[in-house]
Amino acid sequence: MIDRLGSLFESAASMLPMSEARSFELFTEITNYDETACDAWIGRIRCGDTDRVTLFRAWYSRRNFGQLSGSVQIPMTTLNARVPIGGLYGDITYPVTSPLAITMGFAACEAAQGNFADAMEAIDATSITGSEHLVAWLKAVVYGAAERWTDVIDEVKGAGKWPDKFLAGAAGVAHGVAAANLGLFTEAERRLTEANDSPAGEACARSIAWYLAMARRSQGNEDAAVALLEWLQTTHPESKVSAALKDPSYRLTTTTAEQIAARADPWDPSSVVTDNSDRDRLLTQAQAELDRQIGLTRVKTQIERYRAATMMAKVRAAKGMKVAQPSKHMIFTGPPGTGKTTIARVVANILAGLGVISEPKLVETSRKDFVAEYEGQSAVKAAKTIDLALGGVLFIDEAYALVQERDGRTDPFGQEALDTLLARMENDRDRLVVIIAGYSSDIDRLLETNEGLRSRFATRIEFDTYSPDELLEIAKVIATDADSSLSAEASKNLLEAAKQLAQRTLRGRPALDVAGNGRYARQLVEAAEQCRDMRLARGVDIEQLDVDRLQEINGSDMAEAIATVHAHLNIRE
């Protein structure tokens, strides 16, 4: 029987230059009869059959490598079969001249299918003497498919000494790809640029261009990124390239060595075991800061409702239940000094504590951070500002100023910035929460400037003007935090001043709002501390002052402070 199969093999091999299709039929006839005919499986590979089953059968029968070809004295090199071993790094193939080459093709295929353990088992069972660089490359391919980027770097870091200069160049691509996925964009750019000039540059051009584009975009070199993306769209079009061209905010989703090491299953990127102690701490801090706020009863209730809805949505999703997807973006309306920025920090801690955003980051901004002086530049400036807040909360105070009123004319610069913000709120909704703040009527005017803006915000929280009693309590907290205290007379003077302002209007608004509410209380305490220090400094026995006298703000200190602050605010009696 070996003679008959050998004869068929000889015929199939001889037909390759003339009719690859006929050769494939003959090789298939052999494998249909004998599934362990390794050489015939390799012949099928030579004819373009690199199906997973074919690669498995060739690998499974690798111990019979060269048996049929040897029976008819045809070297296996005559077939010129090659197996793909590039993985995500490039269109790289390797000649099938040994059982090791078969193993390489099989393992690369299994890794692409997510069968990492089988791939590594096949590699580890291979004799590697003299072929250590091939095994290192193959492991880098498997680790890359599993997004184990630190292991990729470990396998290829010695590639400069590999005897195969082509694979050494490809290893540079693997190193650059791993660095990019770890967020090390400067290193990624260096490695990929060097690899582009290596013997493997052409075979790996697609991966090099993609990851270089992502690295340069993250470094702020958008023109260079777009040039590479346009080349890819022309030569290797695919959905992610189109998406990256349409959306300048498109970025790689990066990871860290710590996250990779924290996987419960080393082959599963989604199995990261999170240490929840930091999250619990953030939630505790958020609640403590919320409880510490004076007044704000309605605000506290709304924040608790927001927290509960967000938390329960995550619980329902974890159990496979349907979850509504309301926007996380928020509107804070109310006068200045009513705690909007403080509550925004509380929200950042809550969202980070619940795992909605990656860090408790609050980026405070205003119009100047979004709007440029020249047409076409506001989009760029706004994008850079938004990028700073990715993974956290973007807080825009006095947001109504983004688009200014100009005697009935549009504000093109502000509108350009607003359009950019609107797009990013949607495109980056999984890694960005936006809070806009300002007077209620002014925020409503802003929302009217763009039809899609109002629908982006599912939560609106109203902040009320503080009452005189609440301002007194705020002042006492501020004083205590500064190792000061208000005497009964000082408290009485401050409360009386606040009550008088509560009954007045200034420039068409409640006087307490013009004074700044909580900021007004802080200004009074700080001015009173200066008055106290001046009074004590005039004494002749400074060294003998006890703690109580150093802390106490008396009635005259506060009365003088009120006069000073009111004069500064242009508030007349």
Curated annotation (Swiss-Prot):
Entry annotated with the keyword Cytoplasm: yes
Main location: cytoplasm
Record Pfam families: AAA, AAA_lid_6, T7SS_EccA1_N
Keyword Cytoplasm applies: yes
This protein's UniProt keywords: ATP-binding, Cytoplasm, Nucleotide-binding
Chain sites annotated for binding ATP: G334, P335, P336, G337, T338, G339, K340, T341
Annotated localization: Cytoplasm
GO function terms (MF aspect): ATP binding; ATP hydrolysis activity
A single Gene Ontology CC term: cytoplasm
Function as written in the Swiss-Prot or TrEMBL entry: Part of the ESX-1 / type VII specialized secretion system (T7SS), which exports several proteins including EsxA and EsxB. EccA1 exhibits ATPase activity and may provide energy for the export of ESX-1 substrates.
Family: Belongs to the CbxX/CfxQ family.
Subunit structure: Part of the ESX-1 / type VII secretion system (T7SS), which is composed of cytosolic and membrane components.
Protein name, entry field: ESX-1 secretion system protein EccA1
Organism: Mycobacterium leprae (strain TN)
Gene field: eccA1
